[in-house]
Amino acid sequence: MFVKKGDKVRVIAGKDKGTEAVVLKALPKVNKVVVEGVGMIKKHQKPNAENPQGAIVEKEAPIHVSNVQVLDKNGVAGRVGYKVVDGKKVRYSKKSGEVLD
C-alpha cells in the first residue's frame, strides 16, 4: 500500500473531497486508511463505570485508499511510485519526482 501513517494526503472523492489532512492509521489488509477529521461517524457508547450516562462519540471511519492522494513537501498531490536509491527502496511522487520517505 502506498500510504503510510503520518503522510499528509488530499481526499479526492466522497463527501470530504478536497480536504487535506494527516493519516492516523493505515489498514493494508483491507486497503483502507483513517484520515484525521475525514469520514466522521457517530458511535453510540453504552454506559460503563467511567461514563455512567453513555454517550454519542464522533470518530473517524476508515475510507478506501483509492480516495486519497499523497502530498509531497510542496503540497503537490500525485501518484506514488517506488525506486531504489542507494540500495534502499523509497517512495517518490511521480508528478514532482520528489522522494517521500
Swiss-Prot record:
SUPFAM superfamilies assigned: Translation proteins SH3-like domain (SSF50104)
GO biological process: translation
Alphabetically ordered keywords of this record: Ribonucleoprotein, Ribosomal protein, RNA-binding, rRNA-binding
Gene Ontology cellular component annotations, sorted alphabetically: ribonucleoprotein complex; ribosome
GO molecular function: rRNA binding; structural constituent of ribosome
Keyword rRNA-binding attached: yes
Pfam families assigned to the protein according to its UniProt record, in alphabetical order: KOW (PF00467), ribosomal_L24 (PF17136)
PROSITE patterns referenced in this protein's UniProt entry, alphabetically: RIBOSOMAL_L24 (PS01108)
InterPro entries: KOW (IPR005824), Rib_uL2_dom2 (IPR014722), Ribosomal_uL24 (IPR003256), Ribosomal_uL24_CS (IPR005825), Ribosomal_uL24_KOW (IPR041988), Translation_prot_SH3-like_sf (IPR008991)
The family this protein is said to belong to: Belongs to the universal ribosomal protein uL24 family.
Function noted in UniProt: One of two assembly initiator proteins, it binds directly to the 5'-end of the 23S rRNA, where it nucleates assembly of the 50S subunit.
Self-association state and partner proteins as the record states: Part of the 50S ribosomal subunit.
Record-given protein name: Large ribosomal subunit protein uL24
High-level lineage: Bacteria, Bacillati, Bacillota, Bacilli, Lactobacillales
